[in-house]
Amino acid sequence: MSWSWQRRWCGGIEAVIFDVAGTLLDFGSCAPAGVFVEVFAAEGVAISLAEARGPMGAEKRQHVRELLFSPAIAARFAARRGRQPDETDVDRLYAAFVPAQLACLARYGELVPGALETCRVLRARGVKLAANTGYSRDMLEVCLAEARRQGLELDDAVAASDVPRARPRPAMCLLNAARLAVSDVTACLKVDDTVPGIEEGLAAGMWTVAVAVSGNEVGLPLAEWQALPATEQARLRARAVDRLARAGAHLVADSVADLPAAVAAIEARLARGERP
């Protein structure tokens, strides 16, 4: 007879790790998308907002790379330049992206509605609050300053430039968890609006909650979202929910305003001995 033993964390959620743009602040994740369009346009290569949003969640140099080497955009680049793109083009585009992104981040720094109250509720329950992001450290610091200005202080924050390889690999989440000194990775919850961010949380062995409406999948500023007819809101929400659920998110919510209920649902699953 053979035996196998499994350890299970049956306590509650000890830490929530938020993505930044489209999750904690910048409803619609608008800051990065527009800059990618502008940077490629300056090279004489037109890309759509939908194309710019495709790799969202990735480290920003990698985001540039994935855009540039996608078949459709690479073909446009070749038609313009008479050659295929290479890594020197990635370097040049990223070098143009960084100052443009830094220049506009504060304009998109408003917290997602409900974010501050959600964080207050979680703190009152003893939950630690952290963030990680596809932004570089300099970009993240601008976002953190905007969050602090509105009354939100986090316990830890990791930028994509802080780790050797970022999303969808788990390094940022694991660094957050280590610095927060959590009991177990299954006591952590990753909240994100992108597929790479959800995949990152899953790779780290954590619970994941995707936010569908406030983030990249719908991709609209708050005022534009609120102005839509209910039928169009329902269509866009359903499309976003389907994509994020297919990425493996344990739960999908509209925004971080819904997170306390999601945490309660996950804690009930933990109490039953379930694992991510």
Give the location of each predicted region.
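Asp-based, Mg2+/Mn2+-dependent phosphohydrolase catalytic module
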Residues: 1-14, 116-124, 136-276
